[in-house]
Each structure stands twice: as structure tokens, then as C-alpha cells.
């Protein structure tokens, strides 16, 4: 687990050739997910929006950068939580 206020990254998915990346931002601790009404790790993304741990693969920014390991990166928008 990383400390609140630390840099973090979040991936939607990955395979052998491609990483679908929500982006990088700040880990802000546990927050209430607006739809599932459960507290979950929350990352405020630099590009705007938030992503919750239950919606992605996440970790420290360095860990995520290292895990990309030369694969193509496709930036994807944060999850749409509109009804």
C-alpha cells in the first residue's frame, strides 16, 4: 500500500502488447465510491477525474511505469459513472 498523497498510476487493462492507462495522479486514500457505496482506494488523476481501486489495476507511479515494460500505451478516459 502506498501513502496518502503519494504519486500513483492506474491501468484499465493490459495484455502482452498494450496497456490501457487511465493515467497518473495522487492517491487520496479511501473514499466512498458513488455507485457502489463502498469505501475504496481513490486516485485523483492529473488529467481530471478519479478512478477507484475496484475499477483498475493501480499502484505507485513508478510501479505502474515499470510494469508497462515497452508495451504500447493507450490513454483511456476515467470510468463514466453517469446513470
Which residue stretches match the model-derived regions?
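Residues that form ligand- and interface-recognition hot spots within folded domains
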Residues: 12, 31, 47
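A short, compositionally biased
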Residues: 3-5, 35-40
Amino acid at each position: 500500500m502506498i501513502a496518502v498523497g503519494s504519486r500513483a498510476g492506474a491501468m484499465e487493462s493490459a495484455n502482452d502488447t498494450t496497456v490501457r492507462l487511465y493515467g497518473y495522479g495522487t492517491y487520496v486514500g479511501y473514499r466512498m465510491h458513488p455507485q457502489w457505496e463502498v469505501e475504496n482506494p481513490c486516485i485523483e488523476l492529473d488529467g481530471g477525474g478519479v478512478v477507484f481501486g475496484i475499477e483498475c489495476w493501480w499502484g505507485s507511479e513508478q510501479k505502474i511505469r515499470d510494469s508497462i515494460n515497452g508495451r504500447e500505451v493507450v490513454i483511456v478516459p476515467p470510468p463514466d459513472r453517469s446513470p
